[in-house]
Amino acid sequence: MNIKFPIAGLTAVIAAAGLAACGSDTSDSATAAPAASTQTAKPLAEIPSLTGRTTAVALDAGFVEALGTLKLTPGTVGDAELTKAGSLVFPITGGNVKYYKPGTVSPYVQGEIDHEGSGFSLTGGGKKVELTDFVIDPGKSVLTGNVSVDGEEAAKGAPLFFLDGRTLEPLKANDDGTAVLEGTTVKLKQEAADLLNQTFGTDALEAGLVIGVATITVNTA
């Protein structure tokens, strides 16, 4: 990983970008009143190129129960993994993050965390929906992705999940050169709920449904 700032600054930018650490249902995690453009403001810390490690989501029991009630079966797409413990794991394939002094620019955390070539599927009622190529926007507390239904593209870069960081735990730095952020709650967005309800002929899925709790692990060296 190309680190452009000292390790203290790196810790700050990881914490700020960690699945929208301060996100809530009613406010964006890294939004502040604009005081300067990014052309004049300089970031306090920056990760120009994210490489490797994962974003994992431990599926919530309520979500799993809802899938069972709707007779929907989850699966993986591409390089994703579904662990025996019930976590969906998506490799981080790229991205970049800049962290500005809050109040100087809006949003003060900018960039993206990419998960190209992986995703998960829901199958039921003769239909199969695949959600893939996730992109985390740490400034907006949103995860977007591509959606296909029975192999046909239904949406590209659609807002799928809200990332609520109010339950986020402190950053953990490990001896193996990684940093771990755990505790962000992943919730279904209205756009995704509407698409899934329409596809599977139900109205049971609602915005705000808790999908699970996320853990993001990135390389720091």
Where do the language-model regions lie?
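Bacterial N-terminal signal peptides
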Residues: T11-G18
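Bacterial lipoprotein signal-peptidase II cleavage site
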Residues: F5, G18-A32
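Bacterial N-terminal signal peptides that target proteins for export
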Residues: M1-G9
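Ser/Thr-rich, Proline-interspersed low-complexity disordered segments
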Residues: T31-T40
